[in-house]
Curated annotation (Swiss-Prot):
GO CC terms in record: cytoplasm
HAMAP family on file: E4P_dehydrog
Record lineage: Bacteria, Pseudomonadati, Pseudomonadota, Gammaproteobacteria, Enterobacterales
Pfam families in the record: Gp_dh_C, Gp_dh_N
Record's protein name: D-erythrose-4-phosphate dehydrogenase
Keywords, alphabetical: Cytoplasm, NAD, Oxidoreductase, Pyridoxine biosynthesis
Highest taxon, organism lineage: Bacteria
Organism: Citrobacter koseri (strain ATCC BAA-895 / CDC 4225-83 / SGSC4696)
Length: 339
């Protein structure tokens, strides 16, 4: 069965989902039927073909009126401003990938369903009343056919949750802190300009900028036992892609740094293959651009203090890795059936 997908919002994640679908060779499993985006069709085609972070798309891309032609595939282009105007029933859409970054509560999901979609997957953390929040590789087996409105969490949640699970299962986590060192994003300014967050009024290319993050809440969403036991801060740095996460956890069992690395390396080659990777090469952020893993552990940076405080550095391509997980979760949602 080929899952018929529509994408709502063709920004960074929406475009990378399409690219990842074609590059991963999963077109027999997922077919993009339609894309809803307020921007003009010519701009959509151009930005799919040419990308500053990920280079030229290997497939031929062209636009013909309100159609996007990718290779031999024709994708219908829509420009609807309201969810109730979307023709998902007419197009027999199985799963809508809502990549707007704007919608994310149950009401929005229900609007997609009312328009005829069978299921909805948000590309960002959603409200607590959604049917499920999935971090693929960790909890997708909890999905059921009746889970129709689902969140794929965030790129940083997908990065850190597998590592937290591995450390907790092995050593028992007491508490932890997380610092996200995140590439600049579209909600920042090219030059100084107004923003409700005064730090984000400043030019993104000229400063390291602290921003608010809900990552601690994202961790608790997946692992409720860590409520009030994790804190997180975030800074944006003047790069356009790839993120590093500094994870520090206090654990119950005594451990050495080499034992932590052995655990994470074994997981990367075993149970978490394709989700977690491990390296001891002297790499920098650009080297992880276009990496499909959710998390890449940098074993050279693992430290243990007093046998109970573990510090790790985990990398991710916050666009490409997450786009690949969107595809994984879509297939997992379809695999459990539709009600």
């Amino acid at each position: 069965m080929t899952v018929r997908v529509a994408i709502n919002g063709f920004g960074r994640i929406g475009r990378n989902v399409v690219r990842a679908l074609y590059e991963s060779g999963r077109r027999a499993e997922i077919s993009v039927v339609a894309i809803n985006e307020l921007a003009d069709a010519a701009g959509m085609a151009h930005l799919l073909k040419y990308d500053t972070s990920h280079g030229r798309f290997a497939w031929d891309v062209r636009q013909e009126r309100e159609q996007l032609i990718v290779g031999d595939d024709t994708i219908r282009i829509l420009h609807e401003r309201t969810l109730d105007a979307l023709p998902w029933r007419e197009l027999s859409i199985d799963v809508v990938l809502d990549c707007t970054g704007v919608y994310g509560n149950r009401e929005h999901g229900e609007a997609h369903l009312a328009a005829g979609a069978k299921k909805v997957l948000f590309s960002h953390p959603g409200s607590h009343d959604l049917d499920a929040t999935v971090v693929f590789g960790v909890n997708q087996e909890q999905l059921r056919a009746e889970h129709r409105i689902v969140s794929n969490a965030s790129c940083t949640t997908n990065c850190i949750i597998p590592v937290i699970k591995l450390l907790d299962d092995a050593y028992g986590i007491e508490s932890g802190t997380v610092t996200t060192i995140h590439s600049a994003m579209h909600d920042q300014q090219v030059i100084d300009a107004y923003h409700s967050d005064l730090r984000r009024t400043r030019a993104a290319s000229q400063s390291i900028i602290p921003v608010d993050t809900k990552l601690a809440a994202g961790i608790t969403r997946i692992f409720p036992q860590f409520n009030d036991r994790f804190e997180a801060i975030a800074v944006r740095v003047p790069t356009i892609n790839v993120t590093a996460i500094d994870l520090s956890v206090t654990v119950k069992k005594p451990v050495k740094a080499n034992e932590v690395n052995q655990l994470l390396q074994k997981a990367a080659h075993g149970a978490f293959h394709g989700i977690v990777d491990y390296t001891e090469l002297p790499l920098v952020s650009i080297d992880f651009n276009h990496d499909p893993h959710s998390a890449i552990v940098d074993g050279t940076q693992t430290r243990v203090s007093g046998a109970h405080l573990i510090k790790t550095l985990v990398w991710c391509d916050n666009e490409w890795g997450f786009a690949n997980r969107m595809l994984d979760t879509t297939l997992a949602m379809a695999a459990v059936g539709f009600k």
